């Protein structure tokens, strides 16, 4: 038995996701939040929580099912799709950084833009893709997960945020990673899977064609995870105490 790990588990509780009031969901691309956390978003919105979506890249290279729409036109289309999807889930505050899809940006620019948004929105918990899942290899997902983790850690330190990013600090209390293979917190989302599917397959139609093998495979995968977790979505959650100098918290 790892005594240090047990002591941390007892002394520093993993926050419950529903306990907060202000949420920032960060997506590398326009459809990632819906895939990784769409049912949870719908539940939180129905509870009256304040939710902001932040989409980091323009998605211009996600053209595998876009019927020939490419480049700037696809980037604009994906914005429209994202706004439609967010509204279906109950989210009105949607923001776009407009960074070039596929890692075509400077990482420090992403970091600064995240700091600016976190300072402005002042979320209590930040959601981002798990960049440490092992198999994840997309540069945008790796960059966004890492940057979100850094800002979640730095945000409560007013002087640090001002000195490095020229913004105010924020009252971030936790980070939650979606698309993770290591969940330690679960949100009951019974009855919300179809709404999550609609937010993906009826809104992001440039990415998912009805009846296409890729769409059917994604639906099946999401159903398996949903039932595997007992009609819940799973996340890897750390409080601000877990984020620094406590390796056993992992």
What is the predicted role of each segment?
Residues 1-121, 245-248:
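Active-site rim/loop-helix segments in enzyme catalytic domains that contact anionic ligands
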